[in-house]
Amino acid sequence: MNKMYKPIEYSYQVSRNVFAGEHPLFDIYKSSIKGNIPALLKFGITVFLDLTQSYEVPEYASFLPSDVQRISFPIRNCDVPSSVESVMDLFRRLEQLMHEQPQAKLYIHCHGGVGRTGTIVACYYIYFEHLSFEEALDKMRRQYTQSPRSKFMNAPETKRQIEFVRRFAENN
């Protein structure tokens, strides 16, 4: 994968049509009211997988065109999904969506694009690419180096998040 093929600076390519990174409005106070949404849309993102809770950051769904989807899968900051099965259900939903819309481009994000995002991306590799726990974590971390945030933050952020990825691998 080309290291420069990514929608915004603090993002990275996960697979051919899947990208991950910070919240679209992460730098809202430094840029326009719409943050990085115009750049993400120009890049061709058609599905946003939002891992934040509703009270964490400003809502951005109203800035999206009607043909762009936002899927909410809230996870508390620095925490893990409610269950392995809930992530399996999410991935089955994404699998169906990608089957119906093969040209869809998915953008996975939490707030900073590190802990929760890294956890879901590692699980993505286990589910969609059939990688082992170690392979998935290694690949996620390699891809994450495309984001400047990787210079000062590890992904996933917590031991609990890493253990969730291990549990996901054991149950997949």
Residue ranges and their predicted role:
Residues 116:
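Conserved SAM/SAH-binding loop-helix junction
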Residues 1-106, 119-172:
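Cys-dependent protein tyrosine phosphatase-like superfamily
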